Amino acid sequence: MASWDDEDFEVPAAATPAVPANWDDDEEEDVMDSWDAEEPTKAPGPKTTVAAPKKAQRQQIAKIEREMAAMKLKPEDASTKRDRQRQAELDSDMMNASELFGGTGGIADSAAKAEAAPAPAAPAAPMKLSDLAIFHPKEKKDFTNLKETLAPILTDLNKTSPLAYPDFAITFTKALAEPLKVEQLRKLISTLNAYQNEKIREEKAARGKKKKPGLAAASAKINDDKDTSTFNDNFDDFDDFM
């Protein structure tokens, strides 16, 4: 027999059973050993681009056209038509303003700027005549200037309203004379009386010019005859003197 030492004999090692990491039979996902593990990167999504102002304007124009087309399909009253036209004009003005100022937000941006803008100041009150310096005379030359300015304006009213002007002149003169004293009123009356006499002479002269030419010629002939006889008498007196 051969010796046991002559052959190498290896004793098989007993397999050690694997000890489960968990005592439960359910399988679980392995926990990451480190919290610093890198997260998977996400693919970049598509970038959003801001629509150009012209695109918003085209959309607004298309909207207006659709509204106008829809309004044509049904009858509308005058008030609705005016409101629609006014709104269309307003939208058109807003679009023109947007193109002019180059707003990035199109019509909406222009509208927002218009709302944010301060309200315009109220119009100034109209000037009164009493605010003019000419109606505040202080010296005699100032009153003369006022008279020369107002008189032509007021007297021209007689040309357009000859029936109403006399009453106006009387009441206006009375209103102007109200602050005057008695002596000043007498002077005013005397001035008016003198002016009245002047007017009477002018009217008589005007009536005399309207007489018939035949009567005027006959009157002139009579005067000529009278002058001739007088001349003869004077001539006889001259003979007596000689």
Swiss-Prot record:
Q: Ranges of Acidic residues compositional bias?
A: 1-10, 23-38
Q: Which UniProt keywords apply?
A: Cytoplasm, Initiation factor, Protein biosynthesis
Where found? Cytoplasm
Predominant place of localization: cytoplasm
Does DNA damage count among this protein's keywords?
Answer: no
Q: Where is the composition biased (Low complexity)?
A: 11-21
Gene Ontology MF terms in the entry: translation initiation factor activity
Task: Provide the family line.
Answer: Belongs to the eIF-3 subunit J family.
Provide the protein name: Eukaryotic translation initiation factor 3 subunit J
